[in-house]
Amino acid sequence: MQTRNTFFWIKEQMTRSISVSIIVYVITQTSISNAYPIFAQQGYENPREATGRIVCANCHLANKPLDIEVPQAVLPDTVFEAVVRIPYDMQLKQVLANGKKGALNVGAVLILPEGFELAPPDRISPEMKEKIGNLSFQSYRPTKKNILVIGPVPGQKYSEITFPILSPDPATKKDVHFLKYPIYVGGNRGRGQIYPDGSKSNNTVYNATAAGIISKIIRKEKGGYEITIADASDGHQVVNIIPPGPELLVSEGESIKLDQPLTSNPNVGGFGQGDAEIVLQDPLRVQGLLFFFASVILAQIFLVLKKKQFEKVQLSEMNF
């Protein structure tokens, strides 16, 4: 009887442990995969400010290049590609939240004109699906289907992101017209330096919050430092906490100034933004243009034939 009770107790404990592990995994993976888009989505109603600045730049302080490629013109109710390229050196490693080094990830926000939206899966061609890979796009807001976000995703695999876009049809959407429209995009590689609440991440430089002499440096067991700065005039002490990740640049007994860097800047990533233009083309206008070209070509042909006929008449008159 006691053996059976022991068996059931062990089985119950193992079940609990497995359940807890699964819950922790799901929570951590969800928070990691959704972290970057959620920061912007929760803090800003619109990712593009009135100045034209995309809000992701508030957390990703370094400026890096970015490129977007879209067709010059598209017809209504057609699927096309918007390709966003986020270039960086694939050999670089970034500081992770735990202070260790790891590969960079990338993310992007694509701001389309009103009426443009993510193409439904049944409208995407097999060739385009192959370019998209396993990426999962989402709308910035349920009411803002024209603003798409993605990331963070592995940068080594997705430094080039293909968005499948469906163009609107003015025949069914009266607020859409055949015009030239702007498209805005922002993209980051690597982690940010500032969180939305204004606090620093461990992926940035830490400066001295007071001037004086470093009286003590304590290396923490889980990484990072605790630096005590003593004011030379009154002996007042200020403690600076450095998280795991940045490398220390100062030592005990060193005299430092206010805002002097205490650590190196470990950031190797950055944010970039760009824009492009696309024309929603009227099919009737295209047909009219083709008809015009055809009429010009026919006119040229008739002109050549008429000229040859006139030359024959002249030649026959001369022979006569």
Curated annotation (Swiss-Prot):
GO cellular component term, pick one: chloroplast thylakoid membrane
Gene Ontology terms describing biological process: photosynthesis
Cofactor notes: Binds 1 heme group covalently.
Segments traversing the membrane: 286-306
Keywords recorded for this protein, A-Z: Chloroplast, Electron transport, Heme, Iron, Membrane, Metal-binding, Photosynthesis, Plastid, Signal, Thylakoid, Transmembrane, Transmembrane helix, Transport
Membrane topology category: Single-pass membrane protein
Signal peptide: 1-35
Cofactors required: heme
Database matches in PROSITE patterns: CYTF
Localization terms from the record: Plastid, Chloroplast thylakoid membrane
Assembly behavior: The 4 large subunits of the cytochrome b6-f complex are cytochrome b6, subunit IV (17 kDa polypeptide, petD), cytochrome f and the Rieske protein, while the 4 small subunits are PetG, PetL, PetM and PetN. The complex functions as a dimer.
Function, in words: Component of the cytochrome b6-f complex, which mediates electron transfer between photosystem II (PSII) and photosystem I (PSI), cyclic electron flow around PSI, and state transitions.
Protein name: Cytochrome f
Organism the protein comes from: Buxus microphylla
